[in-house]
């Protein structure tokens, strides 16, 4: 459920032209932006990088900033979804798009690009609704869809209030409110990639979703059967039995890495992404601790452009590098590094776990200084099998 790179500025919502779902027969949507069906720019996030603070605290500090509504960890059951709720959500999405279209905001057209993401999300939801025409009750009772719609509503409202509170600071590219807008854009892109993964071509297939790594798939099947989505608390308890979580602090940091859509639930899609990123399964949490929690090169919720900007400081220190979840290919890593001739490149390692790519890159002289620091963590211990906890 990931898609390729190039983003372009798509046609957008035309204000006030949200279609009534009652007249949902028309194959061509009245929205100006509805023709904008293109590859989703999935995105990455969740960890210790952006603020420069490392460790568990840094991991959470960075991941938690944009969503201040997270006081509860046991979510209430999501409300039932009907057409009225979907239409209301579209109006909010429309409002967000109009706020982001303000020429003073001057958003860069690169992933994650909210002016593509929200129209694409609208488009995919239209496809879903057309597939469930006359069966809206089935859709409205689908737990995944209910959680998704409630989260979409929350995140759009949050974005609107960000503009309200940020005022003119929304026009400054390096302000904190703008950083939060980028994080929300990443969350929207994770949500879209997930929706397309669970409802490919508009039909629910969450119960047959294929988890890439066999041992991770076996864990999910044993713990949750055919469930598509489980509350964070249930997930944490099940995972703890196989991979012990050492503290409440570690649990919260783990949540900030795996809960890509920031809704207090873990979906089979998010679990698949996480287990691909931090493979192998046998040492999952050890890998995560070494690569995310304690590694100075790991960047949370950072985009391609932000990586370039961050490495600019180390342009005279070839071998400086940082890494993030790939924006365009969820489940893969992107490593940014400074070359000997003073260029900044970003590469996606294929067919090997991240720690192996970092070890190889260190030996070859490419990845020497994580976030410009002289001390590079030794990851060779991750090559050895984990002492297994039964």
From Swiss-Prot:
PANTHER family in the record: CBL, E3 UBIQUITIN-PROTEIN LIGASE CBL
Alphabetical keyword list: Calcium, Metal-binding, Oncogene, Repeat
Region named Disordered: 1-52
Domain Cbl-PTB, first and last residues per copy: 77-381
Bias kind Gly residues: ranges: 42-52
Protein source organism: Cas-NS-1 murine leukemia virus
Region described as EF-hand-like: 206-278
Region (4H): 77-205
Residues engaged in binding Ca(2+): 259, 261, 263, 265, 270
Positions bound to 4-O-phospho-L-tyrosine: 324
Domain of life: Viruses
GO BP terms in the entry: cell surface receptor signaling pathway; regulation of signaling
InterPro entries: Adaptor_Cbl, Adaptor_Cbl_EF_hand-like, Adaptor_Cbl_N_dom_sf, Adaptor_Cbl_N_hlx, Adaptor_Cbl_SH2-like, Cbl_PTB, EF-hand-dom_pair, SH2_dom_sf
Protein name in UniProt: Transforming protein cbl
Comment on protein domains: Is composed of the phosphotyrosine binding (PTB) domain, a short linker region and the RING-type zinc finger. The PTB domain, which is also called TKB (tyrosine kinase binding) domain, is composed of three different subdomains: a four-helix bundle (4H), a calcium-binding EF hand and a divergent SH2 domain.
Misc. remarks from the entry: This protein is synthesized as a Gag-Cbl polyprotein. This protein has one functional calcium-binding site.
Location of region: SH2-like: 279-381
CDD domains: SH2_Cbl-b_TKB
Keyword Metal-binding listed: yes
């Amino acid at each position: 459920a990931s898609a390729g790179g190039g983003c372009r500025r798509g046609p957008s919502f035309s204000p006030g032209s949200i279609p009534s779902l009652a007249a949902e027969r028309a194959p061509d949507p009245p929205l100006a932006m509805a023709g904008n069906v293109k590859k989703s720019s999935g995105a990455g996030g969740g960890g210790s990088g952006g603020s420069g603070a490392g460790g568990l605290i840094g991991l959470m500090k960075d991941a938690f900033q944009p969503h201040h509504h997270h006081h509860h960890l046991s979510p209430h059951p999501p409300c039932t979804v009907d057409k009225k709720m979907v239409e209301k959500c579209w109006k909010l999405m429309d409002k967000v798009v109009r706020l982001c279209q303000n020429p003073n905001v001057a958003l860069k057209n690169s992933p994650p690009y909210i002016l593509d993401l929200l129209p694409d999300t609208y488009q995919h939801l239209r496809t879903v609704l057309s597939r469930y025409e006359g069966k809206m009750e089935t859709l409205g009772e689908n737990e995944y869809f209910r959680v998704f719609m409630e989260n979409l509503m929350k995140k759009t409202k949050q974005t609107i209030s960000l503009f309200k509170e940020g005022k003119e600071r929304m026009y400054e590219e390096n302000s904190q409110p703008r950083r939060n807008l980028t994080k929300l854009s990443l969350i929207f892109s994770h949500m879209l990639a997930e929706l397309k993964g669970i409802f490919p071509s508009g039909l629910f297939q969450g119960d047959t979703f294929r988890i890439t790594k066999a041992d991770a798939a076996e864990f999910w099947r044993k713990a949750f059967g055919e469930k598509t989505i489980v509350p964070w608390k249930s997930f944490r308890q099940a995972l703890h039995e196989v991979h012990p979580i050492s503290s409440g602090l570690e649990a919260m940091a783990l949540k900030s890495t795996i809960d890509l859509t920031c809704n207090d639930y873990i979906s089979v899609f998010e679990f698949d992404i996480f287990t691909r990123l931090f493979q192998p399964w046998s040492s999952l949490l050890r890998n995560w601790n070494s690569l995310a929690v304690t590694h100075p090169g790991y960047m949370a919720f950072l985009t391609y452009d932000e990586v370039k900007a961050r490495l600019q400081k180390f342009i005279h220190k070839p071998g400086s590098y940082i890494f993030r979840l790939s924006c365009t290919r969820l489940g893969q890593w992107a490593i940014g590094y400074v070359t000997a001739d003073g260029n900044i490149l970003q590469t996606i390692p294929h067919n090997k776990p991240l720690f192996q790519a970092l070890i190889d890159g260190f030996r070859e002289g490419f990845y020497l200084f994580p976030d410009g620091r002289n001390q590079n963590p030794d990851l060779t211990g991750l090559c050895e099998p984990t002492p297994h906890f039964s």
